[in-house]
Structure formats: C-alpha cells, structure tokens
C-alpha cells in the first residue's frame, strides 16, 4: 500500500523545501498553484525547482585500506555540459582527455571470473594510462563500478600517477549525502554501506564525482541525460591545438541488464556513431550481445535456430515473457545492423591478448575516418603499436586507393600550419626577379586522382612527422621514417623554425640561452630565428666554431626568403646586396661558388643537405635526449654529431650551474653529455676494430657541416679525455708527433743529437708519404709531387715492415735536402729545439740578474731581451693566425689557455722591467727588482715542458687543481688567523698609536705559528725570567717602582692554545686530506690526462715555425713574404689557408661517400651488438623468464580448474551410476512383487527411458551459459543418505494450469549448488473439476508448477518423510487443497459403492527427497508424451488412482481419528499402510480427510473448478489419464492421501499429457519411467507407523526410477 505521506519524488512531504519567491519564476508559481488546485501526474520538470549548488569540495574517503581524496560537485540534471567541462578543466585542473572511456554494466553486484577480472582491470588501466584517457562510470560501489574501482585501487597503490576516473551518479541514491552539503569544503566520507539501506556509497577509487540531482530520492535515471550530453560535448573538443581530431569516445559494456542493450543502441545510432567494446564472459547483457555478434550476419540477420535459442536465453536471463523477449531481441538485432562498430573482447582469443587493444582498435576500425586521421589519433595516444598494426598495414608501400581521403578540416589545418611557406614563395619570386629577371613557368596542376591522393598521403605523413617531433614521440618518428617519410624533403627552414619555437614537449632553457646571447630581454612571444640559433651554437661550442646559420650565404638566403626589409636586414647584419669583386678576393673560393649556385626560387633551397644534423642539434638544444639519440643513429657523420652533442650538453650544463636554475637540470645535462661522449667513444672503438686506417681518416677528415673542423678538434673542445686517449687517436698523434721520422727507441736522444750535430740527421730513418696515418694539406701537395718524382719508391711504400733492401731503397729515395727539411719540421724536433733554446735563455737570464747590473745592458742581457721580444711576436702571430674570424674572438680564444696567460704576464712584466732598467737610478734598481720577480714566471713556464713526459705531466695537472683547492682553504684560514691575531694584538698592546704596522702585526706572528714557529719566549710575558716583573705599587730589589701589569695578559696563552689547535691540527690536516683526494682523483685518470695534454702540446708545436726565438724572427719574415706572394697560388689550391694547416684530411666526394657508408655500418653493428648484449644480460633473461613463468602459471591454473571440474563431474557420474544400479534393483524387486504389472511392460518402460535420456542430455548441453549445470539432490532411503546430481527437469514459469503448488525453502550454500527443501508436506491431489468431466475413454490430470517469480526456474519438490521435527515454517507460501471426489468424478456406469468398497493398504518405507533443478537449464518448450524429457528424473514413491476398464475410482472415508489436534492439523509426513493383495481380490480405498481439510477444500473448490474449466476449454478432449489393471472382481483402486498435502507436478508435463492422446499402455510406461509407482494396493493414510510396518520389505511399493 502506498504511503500517503510520501511524495512521488521519494521523500516525505514534510521534507520538501518551500520555494523561494525570489528564485522562483512566475511560470513555476502558476504551475505550483495548479498543482495545489487540481492533482496531476508528477514530473521532474514541473514539480522540482533548481537552486544554486550547495555541495562541492573535496571528499576524504575513510574505511578503506588507505585514504583517498576526490573532488565532487552536486549539479542539476539539466546543467549545460560546457559549464561542466569548464569546471573540470579550469577549477579541477584536468587536462582534456585524448580518449573517453564510458563504462556501462550491471548496477547489481555480480561476480566476475578472477582471471577475466584481472585482464579487464589491467587492460582498462593500461588504456587509460597510455592514452591519457578519462573513465566515466556510475560512481557508486555496486555492480561493474566496483570492479572498475578495484582495478583503479590496484593501480593507484602500485604507481604514483592516478587515472582520471569520473563518477557520474544520481544525488538521490548516494548514501550519507547529507555529509556532502557545504560549499568548497573538505568532507570525511565513510565508505562502509548500511546493509538495510537501499542507497549506495560512492566508490573510493574515483578521482572526481559529478552528482546529478533531479529532486528524487532513491531513484536512478537523473544522471543518464547529463552523462550522455557531457560525453557528446567532450567528444567535440580537439585533442590539442596541433591535431584537428576530436576526443574519441568509446563505450565499454560489462555484464548489465536490458537497459545496457538500449544504451548500446543509442551509442551506435549517434551521429557520428560511437564504437562499443563488449566484454564477453562477464554475464547477462554482454554475453547475449557477444553471442549475437558472433553468430549474426551482416545486416542483423541471424539463423532461425539460433534466433530461438537467443530468445530462450533472453527469457531465462531477464525473466521476460515472450513479448518482452521479442522486443529486446529486436533491439539487439538493431544493434547488430552496425556490427562493424561493435568489438567483442574474448579472453584468450587469438589476436586479442588485452582489452586495451580491443578498445583502441575499436576506435580506429569503428569510426570511419581516413588513414591520416587514424594516424593523428594513434599519435595523440602515443600508441605506436596501434599505428603499426592498424594503419601501416601495408608497410612502406602505398595504401590502396580510397583509404586515404583526408577530410576537409585536415586540409585546412595543413594550410594553417604552413604560413611561412606562402611568404617563402613570395619572397623567392621577388628575390629571383631582382637577380635574374626570369619568371619560372607554372607547374601544371595534377589531375590524376590517384596521384592527388598519394600527395595528400605524403602531406599527411609529413604533418604527422612534424607533430611527432613536436610531441617528442620517438617511436612514431622511427615508424614514419620506416614507412616512407623523406626527411630531406620534409625538413625545410620554416618547419625547423617551427620546431625551435614550439612550446610543447619537455621544458627547455633555449629562451634563456637566446636571451644571454642577444644580451637583451626578449618578449614572451619572441620568434626564435635560425640566425639566433646559430649565435647560440657558436656561444655554446666556444673556440673558433662557426655555425652554418651565421655564415653569410645562409643569412643572404634567409633574408631573401623571409626578410620583407631585405636590404636593411642585410645592412644590419653587416652585409651588402652586391659585394664588389675586389672585396671578394678575401673570401674563399668555395664560399663564392656556393653563393653563385644559390637559386632563390628553387624549392630545394629552403631544405637541408643533412636534415638529421639539424634535427639532432634541435633535439639537444630542446633537451630531448631520447629523440637526440635516435636522430644521432640516422644520417651521416655520426661520430662528429656525438661529439657536438657532448660539447653542447656540457656547455648547457655549465650555463645552468652558473645561473639560478635548479641543480637537477645541470646534473641531467651533464649525464646526457656523458651518454653522447660514450657513444662517440664506442663508435670510434668499433671503427678501429674494423679498419685502423679508415678509423684514423674518420678522426681527421674535414667536417664541412661542422665549421670545417675535425672529430679530434671537436673531442678536444668537448674535453673528452677518453676519446683522445683512445688507441686510434694516440696512434694518429704519435705519427704526427714524429713527423717523417721513423724512430722506435730513444727518440729524444736521437733528436738532440741531430740538433747539436746536424750531420747525424742523414743517419736517421724516415718514412715515405704512404706510411702516414694522416694527411695535412701541405703534405698532400708534397706527396703528390713526390709521387710524380719517385714513382718507383712509392710503389714499395706500403707497410712499415719489410726487408733491409726495401728499407735502403726507401732511404735512398729521399733526397738529403728533403731529409733535413722534414727533420726540422717534425713536431718532436721543434719541441726539443725550443726546449734547448728556452733553457739557454733561462741560464742567461739567471746570469743577468745574479751579477752586477751596469748602466747599459750587456750582450747577455740583449740576447735575453731579443728572446722575449721575438717570443712576444710569435704570440701575436698565434693570435692572428688562429681560426676565429674576429680579432676580439681570436684574443678571447687565445686567453682560454692558462699557459698563454702566464706568458702574457711574464712578457708584460719583463717589458716594464726593461723600460725601467734603461732609466737612471733609482728607476734602474726598480727595473732590476722586476727582473728578479719576473724570472719566477719563466721558471713556472718550465712546467709546461714537463707535460710531454708520461709521469711528470699528470703531476703538473695535480698542482693546478691543488692550487684551486688551496684558495678555498686560504679563505677559511684567514678567518681563524684574523680572529686570533686581532685579539692578541689588542690585549698585549693596549696603548698603540694608529699606523700601518698594526696590520702587519696582526698577521705576522699568527701566520708563522701555522708552520710551527710559536715564539715561545713571548707566550707569557711575565712567566719568564727574562721579562721584568710588574705590579701595582711594587718595587724591585733596587727600589725602583715596577711598571703596572697589562690587564688580561694571562688570556693570551689560552687564546694561543685554541688557535694552534684549530689552525695547526684541524685546518692543516683538512688541507692535506683535500690534496690527497685531488691526488687520487687525478691519479686514477693520469693516463688520460697525460694523453690529453700531449695532444695540446703536439698541436702547439705542429703549427709553430721551425726556428726558436730569438731566431724565430727569420721565420716570421719568411711567412710574411710567402703570404704576400702566394695569394694566386692559394686560389689555385682552393680554400686552404694557413689556419687550415692542422691535422686535417681533405677527401673527394667519392671518398667521403665511402667513409660515410663505413661509419653508418659501424653504427648499425654497434647497436646490434648492444641489443644482443642486452638480450643476453641477466636482467633481461630474468625478465623474460618471469613473463614465461607467469604465463605458464596462468595456464596451469586453467588446467587445474578444468581438472577439478572434470573430477567433480566424474564423481557425480559414479554416484549416479551407483544409485541407478541400486534403485534399478529395488524397482525390479518391487515391481515383481506388485501384482498387475506385466514383465513385458516393465522392459518396455525401461528401454524407453534409456532412449529418451540421450535426447535430454543433448538438449541440456545446448543450453546457454550452463557452466555449472548440476545440482545436488538428497535422498533418505531407509536411513541411508545418497548424494548425486540431477539435471532432470526444466520447467517454464507461468505456463501451466494454475493450481496450488508446493512451497519451498531455499537453502543458500556457499558453493554454486542450490538445494531446495520442501517446507511442508505435500498432498497428492487429483484435479477432477466439473469442467473436465470424465469420459468413458480417459481421465484428466492437471498439475501446476511453482507460482513465485523468484522460484520460476525451479522444478517442484516432492518430499515424503517420516521425521516428526519437520514443520511448516512459511505459512504465506503454504497452500494446500483437500482433494475431493464429486459425483462427476465417478465414471459413468460405475456405482459409487464400488469405490467405497475398494480398499487397499500399502506399506512403504519413508522417503525424504529434495529436488532442485539447475537455474540455467530452464527452457520454455512444449513437450509431448512421446518426447518427454526424462533425464534421470527423481520422484518420490508415487501412487496413482487405478481403474479397471478405464474407469476412475475413488473413495472417501471421513471416520479417521487423530490422536491429537496437532496431529490433525500439522502432520508433516505421509504415513501409508500397505496390505498385500492378490489379483483375485478387490478392496475399497478408504479416503481419510480431516475436518479442517474438508473445510479448506470446500472454500477453494469453486475457484479451482473455474481454473480447470478455463484450461479445459483450450485443450481438446483426450482420454483420461489412468493406470489400469484388471482384476477378477472388476473392482477399482484409489490412492487417497492427507488433505493438507499437495503434490505439484511441472506444468510442462501437464501440457504434454493433455496435448496428444496416447493409449493407456504407453502412458503407463512413461509414468513408470518417471518414477511413478503403479500399485494395485489400497492405500490407507494412518497417523503413525509401527515397527512391524517398517520391517516389511518385499511388499513395499516405493520405487524411484533413474535413467
């Protein structure tokens, strides 16, 4: 009955909020008045009112394993979706998703298979994490949402990042919702639900909740419309500004009811349609949809047999009648019309290992978009596996025609993204018009559709490449390169600038570097140009590095392409439009040729020769390490690229450490630098293993793209000691160090002998041109000349080893003049020549300052002065001939060397001293003192010479590092020294006057105390005897007044003790420890240090003139003459200048190509080896093994499950077979003792039962979702308990004749089995109403099945028990009918007295039976008698009314007495007496009925007759069912039972028996099969059984028949 105080909204009327006058519109007022005046149907729109939300903030979930927080808001059900999205993005700080997964399923709790749940959870989380998706759910902890919550909980406990899971739930069904009321509050929310409440708690694994309120309480539906609109609105948003794709939406269905099928249909009918993924095996709706998807053909057509099976499944699953099931079936078929949009995930099926692949594949296949759009989606999700398997299915080949048609918006996007190109074309045309005055012919427009489509595909691939680079998707860049993107065609100047100006991807410090280089504050939207990048590269590379972006030809091109104010721009850059030829003489010929070749209108002009070079530098400057490493592997000059990246990263790390940036940035950059340095070293090692000579060429060939440098120079610039210390580099340096000399032992001694005794030069060994591991430009020329002059000798000069004849041949082939020239040009000879000269200079300098100095310099002093002046000229030459272009940069680079600074100080000091020395006294004395100080610097300079020695070189570096350490120590020492010095001076000398001596006195004594001089006599002034005594008013022995004592003088010794403890013990030992650390640090890398210093030394002497100072002035004069006279020759040579005469090799294009190929092969082989090494590493093996073990364990679990199921099944079969044998034996024995049954009938019945059992088995096997089709049955058979399984009968709910049925009590066991135990004892009832009057040839038996909807799937139970403690426990379900026999029940022609006189007493054992039927096997089917399913059906001992001559007999006896009223009313057992009879006698059946039963029978008789009449009209006349046995007396028997017992038979059987008339014999056989015992005995119901009756065995009539 409806509660009058409760409103339709679900709340009590007194809980309603009165409407606010101000907030209520006039329309609502009128409506509210109308509601008051006249009643109308309640609706949300009319009877609810919106208010500003009063519930939003943060939830803190309690009651779980750990505390979670979630944002929440309560909104109206009709809130606009754009407002909600604005809230989510702005207030909740959520990033727009790249994918939206909407999960739908059952709201009621259900169990998922553990393995399926694990796969579902992992796949869902992986899909969300890898793509940056949002997950929409119902938000409450029931049904599918709880399974999603479990997956989220597992994920959040294992990783930091939480998946964005948004629960959209109705406000009215949320438990404890009153706790959430409050604006911008933090509320504690209890997740423990109240078992008595119909409301649900929110799931604590979600991150956000949107609670839709439509004014109702305890009702779902408020969120449905809001959720759909919000999903649609989000799907219209763009993934990001670069990708034109909207946010893709996919529906995920797990389990669910009929409403889920409707949701699927809505998704599929949306415009555009939304793909749906169905999780097969989760139950109910998802299983039905997946079944239909599997067997349905295109267009929603399904086979007729499968159609019937599907309808049966729908009826059984959802408890639907035929009309409802047909309606739902129609919806499913409508869904199947768009079968291509539905993806079914089946666990363990081929090709679908994970549900996340099913979700992402469904989006690509389901949405009918072009290949470029699919590529954009895969790129947005960062799922290269999806792109490779779904989009690039044709590999590098072109896709088929028609699959590429890009939508119009993508073309528009393409145009928008290339604004510079339009400018470029205009600029190019203008530039060319000025220069050449020609107009380029228009290219004909392409009309071939295939070519247009392929061009669009190429454009789409290039756009995807740009997006992949911007978004830092390394795998996608690799995939696109593998699938046909031409990087040389792709990379243009505008695109490269766009990459440098992107704000996406990892954070970088490029803007800070540009600001430092430009030395000005840049606006936030400053557009970085490539010229800016060139300046940054030069700044970071340092030294003489010159970037291509800052060279004149590139700047001219750049301004022609993009500069609207071209002449002004060129002028600002220090350039002019047309340079005169005279100025061009100073330019390199190569540069001039490049400028002549520039065709501004050529599309290839804005592209790059080596695109991977430019992209790798971009990746390094943008701090994209993975991308940089990938781009390094591609393209040419890998070794040079690695060294450039190493240097750039190191310089960026240095800049970061000096600025206010976080230390982590500097550390990361330093690590990246080490990574690239290691790559360069490994590549050098790989090359050296393959071919030593080519590896040396790699080190020395000119890198035209890297400032015409070499790999060795780049390694030195990057201070890559390991690279320089590599065997290959050292072999090269050794060859260079020795020049043309061939000396294996004691080279220094031989060279000194050659210098001091020039004739010995002729006895030294020399190498020919072909023995060199390197070729400089000058030696290249000399070698060519020698090839012309000495072809015979060069033919032999292939190796260093040979016999003596070849050696003599080689030596004779080198002229004496060449030997002398090569000897003095060798760096080792120059080194010793300079060293001897320097030592001579030092000796003379010592002599000059040690002897008396005259007014005019002596000869020795003039030699010293000339040496230093010539040395100063040499330093000037070094500066002028260094690589940098500008003089300021030359000086800056020169000063970066510490020894150059020492030379500068020493020369400058000496010059000042020399000028003062030439003056008169006292200035001459000052000059001499400056000489004396200056010689210190010249002695220090000797340390540089030690660098050539393997052992002394590292010590020089240690000294330099220790000096830096000591500077820090001096600062600390100064603090301690000052603290003691000032205190001591102030205490001991209180009356000092101001003077500079005070400053000296502060430091004087404390400083020397550090070294152990403690001035013992002055520690305590008055303790020593030497000091005079002091005191106030005291006199000495001579009577003189003693001086007063200094106050506080006693403090001095105490302060001194503390000072010495800190200074001498602590600080000095600290300094020693620091020095020790530095020593071991350098000692560990001493070999690399020495080799690195050796490079510097060799390069220094390689470039120096032959003669040492002061004779070097001759070399300078020679150089000037050669430069003035040799310009024409240099033009013929090419672009070689003096500064290029270093360790550099110039190769032809063909040689360069071969060298690049060799280098690329080495890179590939190196990475192949690393990959093999990684795969064979223990970590990788452990990982692979663990994966395999995990897979094996999962399979073993499956096998164990199957094995357990098979064992259970086999045990069941064994039990049933054993019972079958026993029951068969009992039946045979009983039937043999029962009169009236022919043996032939028995055999026929048994054979019939076995044949039909097979058909039933097949039907049961075809049942859908019959994973566990067994139920447990209990029989108490003479005190024995037998357990076996039965799948006998399936009943259909509500289709039989309505009769009073048995009532049951359901016992829920922990296992899947269901036991049904009868609550009350049942009465066998013969339904013989007036409407079904007996006919001469038949009888009618109508029985019904269960009535309750919950028990609609259950077959009836018939219990026959002796136990007295069984009682009726459920009075509501107990319905009994007292059987009665009317006059109409008696067959025509038979006397009523015959019935009463026929008595039969039957003795039987007590049988208690509990029958249950599998829930999953219920089918709605019409069974006919000849097709009756009899799969091991178990019925209790039945006795039916028997008649002779097809006449029904029955007897009623009202004279039975009960021992008590309780026995009369609550007797719960059948108690029968059996009297043995013979065929020759006939007895009457006394019908015993209690008064209560009679009254109950009279009350319900009329209704039953009406029901029977209603059924009889629809059923044709058939022979009345009876089991007949003829006896001699012609008497008939009737089974009569207690009236308070009702026997229910399945309505199926009632229908089948009514449907087709059969002869009596066949029906009897079927009933015998079904466990109905035929008896010719009179049954009399008595109130108890005696012990004697229990002993009766062979007279028993109870039989139970099984197949």
Curated annotation (Swiss-Prot):
InterPro entries assigned to the protein according to its UniProt record, in alphabetical order: Ion_trans_dom, TRPM, TRPM_SLOG, TRPM_tetra, TRPM_tetra_sf
Catalysed conversion reaction: Ca(2+)(in) = Ca(2+)(out); Mg(2+)(in) = Mg(2+)(out); Mn(2+)(in) = Mn(2+)(out); Ni(2+)(in) = Ni(2+)(out)
Region (Disordered): 16-47, 403-445, 573-596, 777-810, 1352-1380
Residue numbers on the Extracellular membrane side: 852-897, 950-961, 1076-1105
Record-level GO cellular component terms: axon; endoplasmic reticulum; endoplasmic reticulum membrane; plasma membrane
Topology in membrane: Multi-pass membrane protein
Tissue expression profile of the protein: Expressed in the retina where it localizes to the outer plexiform layer. Specifically, it is expressed in retinal bipolar cells (BPCs) of the ON subtype. Highly expressed in benign melanocytic nevi and diffusely expressed in various in situ melanomas, but not detected in melanoma metastases. Also expressed in melanocytes and pigmented metastatic melanoma cell lines. In melanocytes expression appears to be regulated at the level of transcription and mRNA processing.
Comp. bias (Basic residues): 427-438
Basic and acidic residues composition-biased segments: 778-787, 798-808, 1352-1376
Residue ranges of the TM segments: 831-851, 898-918, 929-949, 962-982, 1055-1075, 1106-1126
Keywords: Cell membrane, Cell projection, Coiled coil, Congenital stationary night blindness, Disease variant, Endoplasmic reticulum, Glycoprotein, Ion channel, Ion transport, Ligand-gated ion channel, Membrane, Receptor, Sensory transduction, Transmembrane, Transmembrane helix, Transport, Vision
Location, primary (coarse class): membrane
Stretches in topological domain Cytoplasmic: 1-830, 919-928, 983-1054, 1127-1603
Compartmental location: Cell membrane; Endoplasmic reticulum membrane; Cell projection, Axon
Keyword Phosphoprotein: no
Activity regulation comment: Inhibited by extracellular zinc ions. Inhibited by intracellular Mg(2+). Activated by the neuroactive steroid pregnenolone sulfate. Negatively regulated by activation of GRM6 receptors in the ON-bipolar cells.
Residues listed as glycosylation sites in the UniProt record: 1076
GO BP annotation list: calcium ion import across plasma membrane; calcium ion transmembrane transport; cellular response to light stimulus; G protein-coupled glutamate receptor signaling pathway; metal ion transport; monoatomic cation transmembrane transport; protein tetramerization; visual perception
Coiled-coil spans in chain: 1182-1240
Record's subunit section: Interacts with TRPM3; the interaction results in the formation of a heteromultimeric cation channel complex that are functionally different from the homomeric channels. Interacts with GPR179. Associates with both guanine nucleotide-binding proteins G(o) and beta-gamma G protein dimer; implicated in directly regulating TRPM1 channel open-state.
Free-text function comment from the UniProt entry: Constitutively open nonselective divalent cation-conducting channels which mediate the influx of Ca(2+), Mg(2+), Mn(2+), Ba(2+), and Ni(2+) into the cytoplasm, leading to membrane depolarization. Impermeable to zinc ions. In addition, forms heteromultimeric ion channels with TRPM3 which are permeable for calcium and zinc ions. Plays an essential role for the depolarizing photoresponse of retinal ON bipolar cells.
Disease listed for this protein: Night blindness, congenital stationary, 1C: A non-progressive retinal disorder characterized by impaired night vision, often associated with nystagmus and myopia.
Recorded family membership: Belongs to the transient receptor (TC 1.A.4) family. LTrpC subfamily. TRPM1 sub-subfamily.
Name this polypeptide is given: Transient receptor potential cation channel subfamily M member 1
Annotated source species: Homo sapiens (Human)
Gene: TRPM1
């Amino acid at each position: 009955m409806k509660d009058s105080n409760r409103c339709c909204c679900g709340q009590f009327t007194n809980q309603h909020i009165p409407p606010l006058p101000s907030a209520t519109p006039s329309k609502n007022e009128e409506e509210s008045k109308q509601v008051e005046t006249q009643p109308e149907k309640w609706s949300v729109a009319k009877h609810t009112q919106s208010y500003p939300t009063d519930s939003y903030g943060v939830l803190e979930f309690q009651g779980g394993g750990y505390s979670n927080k979630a944002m929440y808001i309560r909104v109206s059900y009709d809130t606009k979706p754009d407002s909600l999205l604005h809230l989510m993005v702005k207030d909740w700080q959520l990033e727009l998703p790249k994918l939206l997964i909407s999960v739908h399923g059952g709201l009621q709790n259900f169990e998922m298979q553990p393995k399926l749940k694990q796969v579902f959870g992992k796949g869902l989380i992986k899909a969300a994490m890898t793509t940056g998706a949002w997950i929409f759910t119902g938000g409450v902890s029931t049904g599918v949402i709880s399974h999603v919550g479990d997956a989220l909980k597992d994920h959040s406990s294992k990783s930091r990042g939480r998946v964005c899971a948004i629960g959209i739930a109705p406000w009215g069904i949320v438990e404890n919702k009153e706790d959430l009321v409050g604006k911008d509050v933090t509320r504690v929310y209890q997740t423990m639900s109240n078992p008595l409440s119909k409301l649900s708690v929110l799931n604590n694994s979600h991150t956000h909740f949107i609670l839709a309120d439509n004014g109702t309480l305890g009702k779902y539906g408020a969120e449905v419309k809001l959720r759909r609109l919000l999903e649609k609105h989000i799907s219209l948003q763009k993934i990001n500004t670069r990708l034109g794709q909207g946010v893709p939406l996919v529906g995920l269905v797990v389990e669910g009811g009929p409403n889920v099928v409707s949701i699927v249909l809505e998704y599929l009918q949306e415009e555009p349609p939304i793909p749906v993924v169905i999780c097969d095996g989760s139950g109910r709706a998802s299983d039905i949809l997946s079944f239909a998807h599997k067997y349905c053909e295109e267009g929603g057509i399904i086979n007729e047999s499968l159609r019937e099976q599907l309808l049966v499944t729908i009826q059984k699953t959802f408890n639907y009648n035929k009309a409802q099931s047909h309606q739902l079936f129609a919806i499913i078929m409508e869904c199947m019309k768009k079968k291509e949009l539905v993806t079914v995930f089946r666990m363990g099926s081929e090709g679908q290992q994970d549900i996340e692949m099913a979700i992402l594949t469904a989006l690509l296949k389901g949405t009918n978009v072009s290949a470029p759009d699919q590529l954009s989606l895969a790129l947005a999700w960062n799922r290269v596996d999806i792109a490779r398997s779904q989009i690039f299915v044709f590999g590098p080949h072109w896709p088929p025609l028609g699959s590429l048609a890009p939508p119009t918006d993508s073309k528009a996007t393409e145009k928008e993204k290339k604004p510079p190109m339009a400018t470029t074309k205009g600029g190019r045309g203008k530039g060319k018009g000025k220069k050449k005055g020609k107009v380029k012919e228009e290219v004909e427009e392409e009309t071939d559709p295939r070519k247009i489509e392929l061009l669009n595909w190429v454009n789409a691939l290039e756009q995807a490449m740009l997006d992949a680079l911007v978004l830092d998707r390394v795998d996608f860049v690799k995939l696109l390169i593998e699938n046909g993107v031409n990087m040389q065609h792709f990379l243009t100047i505008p695109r490269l600038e766009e990459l440098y100006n992107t704000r996406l991807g990892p954070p970088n410090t490029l803007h800070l570097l540009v600001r430092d280089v430009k030395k000005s504050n840049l606006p936030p939207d400053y557009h970085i140009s490539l010229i800016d990048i060139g300046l940054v590269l030069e700044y970071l590379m340092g030294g003489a590095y010159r970037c291509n972006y800052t060279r004149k030809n590139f700047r001219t091109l750049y301004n022609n392409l993009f500069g609207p104010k071209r002449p002004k721009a060129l002028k600002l850059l220090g350039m002019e439009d047309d340079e005169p030829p005279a100025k061009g003489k100073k330019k390199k010929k190569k540069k001039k040729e490049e400028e002549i070749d520039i065709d501004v209108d050529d599309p290839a002009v804005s592209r790059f020769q080596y695109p991977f070079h430019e992209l790798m530098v971009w990746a390094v400057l943008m701090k994209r390490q993975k991308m940089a490493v990938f781009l390094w592997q591609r393209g040419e000059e890998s070794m040079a690229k690695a060294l450039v990246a190493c240097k750039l990263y190191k310089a960026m790390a240095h800049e970061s450490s000096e600025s206010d940036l976080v230390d982590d940035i500097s550390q990361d950059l330093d690590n990246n630098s080490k990574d690239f340095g290691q790559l360069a070293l490994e590549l050098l090692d790989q090359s050296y293993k393959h071919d030593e000579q080519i590896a040396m060429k790699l080190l020395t060939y000119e890198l035209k793209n890297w400032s015409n440098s070499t790999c060795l120079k780049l390694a030195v610039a990057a201070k890559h000691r390991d690279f320089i210390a590599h065997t290959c580099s050292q072999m090269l340096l050794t060859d260079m160090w020795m020049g043309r000399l061939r000396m294996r032992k004691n080279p220094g001694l031989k060279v000194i002998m050659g210098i001091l005794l020039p004739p010995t030069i002729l006895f030294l060994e020399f190498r020919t041109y072909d023995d060199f591991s390197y070729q400089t430009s000058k030696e290249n020329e000399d070698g060519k000349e020698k090839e012309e002059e000495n072809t015979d000798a060069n033919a032999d000069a292939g190796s260093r080893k040979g016999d003596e004849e070849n050696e003599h041949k080689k030596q004779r082939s080198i002229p004496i003049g060449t030997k002398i020239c090569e000897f003095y040009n060798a760096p080792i000879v120059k080194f010793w020549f300079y060293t001897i000269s320097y030592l001579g200079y030092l000796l003379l300098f010592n002599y000059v300052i040690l002897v008396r100095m005259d007014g005019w310099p002596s000869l020795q002093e003039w030699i010293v002065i000339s040496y230093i002046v010539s040395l100063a000229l040499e330093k000037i030459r070094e500066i002028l001939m260094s690589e940098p272009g500008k003089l300021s940069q030359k000086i800056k680079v020169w000063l970066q060397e510490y020894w150059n600074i020492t030379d500068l100080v020493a020369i400058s000091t000496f010059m000042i001293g020399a000028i003062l020395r030439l003056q008169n006294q006292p200035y001459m004395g000052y000059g001499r003192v400056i000489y004396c100080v200056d010689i210190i610097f010249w002695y220090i300079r000797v340390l540089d010479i030690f660098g050539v020695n393997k052992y002394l070189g590292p010590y020089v570096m240690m000294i330099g590092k220790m000096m830096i350490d000591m500077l820090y120590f001096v600062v600390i020492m100064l603090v301690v020294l000052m603290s003691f010095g000032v205190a001591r001076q102030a205490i001991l000398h209180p009356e000092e006057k101001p003077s500079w001596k005070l400053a000296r006195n502060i430091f004087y004594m404390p400083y020397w105390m550090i070294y152990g001089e403690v001035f013992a006599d002055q520690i305590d002034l008055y303790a020593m005897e030497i000091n005079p005594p002091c005191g106030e008013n005291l006199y000495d022995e001579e009577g003189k007044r003693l001086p007063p004592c200094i106050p506080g003088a006693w403090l001095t010794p105490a302060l001194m003790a503390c000072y010495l403890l800190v200074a001498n013990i602590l600080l000095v030992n600290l300094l020693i420890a620091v020095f020790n650390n530095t020593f071991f640090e350098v000692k560990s890398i001493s070999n690399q240090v020495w080799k690195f210093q050796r490079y510097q030394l060799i390069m220094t002497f390689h470039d120096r003139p032959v003669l040492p100072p002061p004779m070097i002035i001759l070399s300078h004069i020679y150089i000037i003459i050669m430069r003035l006279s040799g310009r024409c020759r240099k033009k013929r040579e090419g672009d070689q200048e003096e500064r290029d005469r270093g360790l550099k090799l110039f190769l032809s294009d063909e040689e360069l190509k071969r060298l690049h190929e060799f280098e690329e092969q080495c890179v590939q082989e190196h990475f192949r080896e690393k990959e093999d090494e990684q795969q064979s590493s223990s970590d990788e093996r452990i990982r692979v093994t663990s994966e395999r073990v995990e897979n094996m364990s999962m399979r073993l679990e499956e096998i164990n499950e199957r094995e357990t199921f098979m064992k259970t099944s086999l045990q069941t079969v064994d039990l049933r077979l054993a019972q079958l044998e026993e029951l068969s034996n009992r039946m045979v024995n009983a039937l043999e003792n029962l009169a009236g049954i022919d043996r032939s009938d028995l055999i026929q019945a048994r054979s019939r039962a076995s044949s039909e059992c097979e058909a039933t088995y097949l039907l049961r096997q075809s049942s859908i979702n019959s994973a566990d089709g067994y139920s447990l049955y209990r029989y108490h058979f003479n005190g024995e308990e037998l357990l076996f399984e039965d799948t006998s009968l399936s009943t259909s709910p509500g289709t039989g004749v309505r009769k009073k049925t048995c009532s049951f009590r359901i016992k829920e066991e922990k296992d899947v089995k269901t036991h049904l135990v009868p609550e009350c004892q049942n009465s066998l009832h013969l339904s013989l109403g007036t409407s079904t009057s007996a006919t001469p040839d038949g009888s009618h038996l109508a029985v019904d099945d269960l009535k309750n909807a919950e028990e609609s799937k259950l077959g009836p139970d018939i219990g026959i028990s002796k136990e007295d403690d069984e009682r009726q426990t459920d009075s509501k379900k107990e319905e009994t009918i007292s059987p009665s026999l009317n006059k109409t029940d008696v067959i025509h022609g038979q006397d009523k007295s015959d019935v009463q006189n026929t008595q039969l007493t039957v003795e039987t054992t007590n049988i208690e039976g509990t029958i249950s039927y599998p829930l999953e096997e219920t089918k709605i089917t019409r069974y006919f008698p000849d097709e009756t399913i009899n799969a091991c059906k178990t019925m209790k001992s039945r006795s039916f009314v028997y008649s002779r001559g097809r006449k029904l007999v029955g007897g009623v006896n009202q004279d039975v007495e009960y021992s008590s009223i309780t026995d009369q009313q609550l007797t719960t057992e059948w108690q029968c007496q059996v009297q043995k009879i013979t065929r020759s006698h006939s007895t009457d059946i006394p019908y015993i009925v209690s008064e209560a039963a009679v009254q109950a029978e009279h009350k319900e008789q009329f209704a039953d007759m009406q029901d029977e009449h209603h059924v009889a009209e629809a059923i044709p006349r058939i022979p009345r069912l009876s089991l007949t046995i003829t006896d001699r007396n012609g008497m008939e028997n009737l089974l009569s039972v207690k009236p308070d017992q009702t026997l229910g038979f399945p309505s199926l059987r009632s229908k089948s028996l009514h449907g087709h008339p059969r002869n009596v014999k066949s029906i009897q056989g079927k009933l015998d099969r079904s466990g109905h015992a035929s008896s010719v005995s009179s049954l009399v119901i008595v109130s108890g059984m005696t012990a004697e009756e229990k002993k009766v065995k062979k007279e028993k009539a109870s039989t139970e028949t099984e197949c």
